[in-house]
């Protein structure tokens, strides 16, 4: 892994040419009073360093062969007794392959020296007043040396636009990690299906998911799990997870683990009592057909929008057939009448963040999919109670979501272990 991290830093150094990149990790965050949230490193910082401790900054030079420097906390026996192991600069330098490493306490003295006679600084710009102030302070310190013939950089460039494009294409190590995260999450969804029955609470199902994530090496859930029974599934980001599960209703679970800094993201919808009703099956099969059409369009050379357009066409025609929308397919698409039942996009990038980085459009047009990209494919339909809607469809929310790795010839569904056909779901729940 050290070699992969070094390769990423060297690639960034080539892209910034005669500049210097300065990238901080995330700060620790207080939950309340003396209780902290579990610490997670900043995704950009971790992508380049693999380093998980707070109070750290990486500096990468576009000159001198891509020199990389880590600033981190010193070893401290007393703090390690209370808070746990620290690498310290020397061990971190060796473990993660940096050219140099220093105490974070010395950065105000060392960093201005590194900014002399370079063209520009690459850093996350506008992420917060405190970080911007630190950058300006280092810059001003360098400017004070102009009488010595040392020039300060005169441009600030947001490094995230460069790193976004690097992170968009996953290397083989990232792909393998994401496959493993997907496998853990798939098994968690299977266990959740097996334990679901009327009378249980949503939070009981959530607990099973979180238990399986942690038991299998996941450090955190990738996001707050959605466990939404019945009408709760019509709330796209429902996270209360505190309602009882009712016989005859569906349960929508949107949950995935994070493993070694990489997210998985799966949604399945299934009957609480193990058997779809006729109306539930009609809508479910429609959403599944839309997802399969979108997956078929998830291939290199196709536009980012191609899977979404394919899903929308299938859903719109299905809504017409079920008398939920009225008019021709072209009319429903033009007026976006389908939008009242399907109001979100069909996917997003996936990686170190669950809604991962990378532009969806380039120069005003949808970008083309390419091997190594990972995205979700997640059409759905959400039908609230309304006198205009047949009663058998009221309060049904369905979403089916898989994670797709674009390959040379199409895509690999890395979450395929999770059952999603009506027959497979009913068979699993009956076992």
Give the positions of each predicted feature.
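Active-site neighborhoods and metal-handling regions in enzymes and metal-associated proteins
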Residues: 1-431
């Amino acid at each position: 892994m050290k070699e992969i991290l070094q390769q990423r830093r060297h690639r960034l150094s080539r892209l910034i040419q005669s500049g210097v990149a300065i990238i901080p990790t995330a700060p620790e965050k207080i939950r309340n009073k003396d209780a902290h949230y579990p610490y997670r490193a900043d995704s950009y910082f971790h992508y380049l360093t693999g380093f998980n401790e707070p109070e750290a900054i990486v500096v990468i030079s576009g000159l001198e062969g891509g020199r990389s420097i880590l600033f981190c906390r010193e070893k401290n026996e007393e703090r390690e007794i209370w808070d746990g192991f620290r690498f310290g600069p020397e061990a971190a330098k060796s473990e993660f392959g940096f050219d140099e490493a220093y105490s974070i306490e010395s950065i105000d003295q060392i960093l201005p020296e590194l900014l002399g006679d370079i063209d520009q600084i690459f850093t996350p710009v506008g992420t917060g007043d405190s970080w911007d102030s630190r950058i300006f302070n280092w810059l001003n310190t360098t400017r004070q040396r102009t009488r010595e013939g040392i020039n300060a950089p005169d441009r600030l460039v947001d490094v995230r636009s460069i790193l976004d494009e690097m992170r968009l294409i996953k290397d083989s190590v990232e792909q393998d990690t994401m496959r493993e995260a997907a496998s853990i999450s798939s098994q968690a969804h299977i266990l959740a299906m097996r334990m679901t029955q009327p009378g249980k609470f949503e939070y009981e199902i959530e607990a099973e998911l979180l238990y399986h994530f942690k038991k299998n090496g996941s450090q955190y859930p990738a996001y707050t799990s959605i466990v939404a029974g019945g009408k709760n599934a019509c709330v796209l980001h429902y996270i209360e997870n505190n309602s009882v599960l009712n016989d005859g209703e569906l349960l929508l679970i949107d949950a995935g683990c994070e493993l070694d800094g990489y997210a998985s993201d799966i949604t399945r919808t299934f009957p609480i009592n193990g058997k779809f009703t006729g109306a539930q099956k009609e809508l479910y099969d429609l959403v599944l057909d839309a997802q399969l059409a979108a997956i078929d369009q998830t291939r290199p050379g196709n536009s980012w929008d191609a899977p979404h357009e394919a899903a929308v066409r299938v859903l719109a025609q299905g809504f017409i057939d079920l008398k939920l929308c009225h008019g021709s397919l072209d009319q429903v698409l033009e007026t976006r009448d389908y939008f009242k039942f399907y109001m979100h996009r069909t996917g997003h990038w996936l990686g170190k963040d669950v809604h991962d980085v990378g532009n969806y459009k380039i120069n005003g047009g949808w970008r083309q999919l390419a091997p190594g990209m990972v995205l979700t494919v997640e059409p759905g339909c959400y039908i609230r109670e309304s006198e205009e809607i047949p009663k058998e469809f009221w309060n049904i929310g369905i979403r089916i979501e898989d994670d797709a790795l674009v390959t040379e010839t199409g895509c690999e569904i890395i979450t395929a272990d999770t059952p999603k056909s009506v027959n497979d779901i009913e068979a699993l729940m009956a076992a």
